[in-house]
Amino acid sequence: MTNKIVAIQGDIPSKLNPETDTSIFLANEIQNKRYKIFYYEPKNLSIINSKVVAKGCFITINYHKKKFYKILKKKSLELVKSKFILIRQNPPFNLEYISTTYILDLIKTKVKIINDPTSIRSISEKLYSSRFQKYMPNTIFTQNINEIKAFFKKNKKVILKPIHGYSGNDIHLLTRFKSNLIKRFVKKNGHIMCQKFLPKISNGDKRVFVINGKLFGVISRIPKKGSFLSNMSKGAKVINTKLTKVERQISNLIAKDLKKENIFFAGIDFIDQKLNGDINVTSPTGIKTYYDLSGKNLAKTFWKELKA
């Protein structure tokens, strides 16, 4: 019989904010079902004698204490002994990240892994959105400077994003063409995403939560004054909201495709009823904040859909 263990591959717990962190929220919920929580960092994942092993620690979560987690025991765990593995480390989606998906591929027929490591690897979050480009503002993916220049000339205000970035890091708003900046940006990132700027971002974006191919909630994130970044990590204010008919139709279409691609948990982002190209499948976040705003516990939904 499989042990009641949930292994979480994530960033070091001491760097997480329990007030907003989704991984901790999910861990706390499954802990209430008497599962043990084993936490490890990606760098501590190995293949030893043909076995997938992680060095980490068993922890308990307690939201009522200043230090929200307690280390019970440090251990090397053969991960097939767990019932679920959650891939929860933040991007960048680099070779180190990709390597962990190949390692976890070796045991995914024996342990339920969320999200499926093969699917994470094959779905580049921003490039995947190009399947639904008719629902997006004008967008190109390129590293050709002349293409970027022509795109800027047509659209006047343009957002530049690294394809494999996260949390609003290294995003630029171009109001005039800056050749040197773009050359440096392309040299650093290779292919980049260029998108027509949507001024209504000042009213906030929307993050839709997708679990097992279904829509389960939405929040709006409003950039702080003087910013165009709606990420919570960049100081955005989060409020309750609802989806429009158009947003719901697009979200259901994407959710259906995500389920077909074996993506269990995802976040879809909109600005002004347009898909902004961020479909988060690596480490979707926001459900703790959604719970604080609405009282609806999507961590319970998550585990219920997994039949934990």
Across the structure, where does each feature detected by a protein language model lie?
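Short acidic-glycine loop/turn motifs at beta-strand connectors
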Residues: 34, 46, 175, 210-215, ...
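ATP-dependent carboxylate activation and anion-phosphoryl transfer catalytic cores
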Residues: 10, 15-19, 242-308
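Short glycine-enriched loops at secondary-structure junctions
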Residues: 117-121, 221-224, 271-275
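Extreme N-terminal starter segment of soluble prokaryotic enzymes
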Residues: 2-7
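Conserved N-proximal alpha/beta basic substrate-recognition cap immediately N-terminal to
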Residues: 14-141
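Phosphate-binding site of ATP-dependent enzymes
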Residues: 145-146, 153-157, 164-250, 254, ...
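Redox-cofactor binding/interface segments in oxidoreductases and associated redox assembly factors
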Residues: 8, 86-87, 195
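Short glycine-rich anion-binding loops that position phosphate/pyrophosphate groups of nucleotides
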Residues: 12, 89-92, 163-165, 284
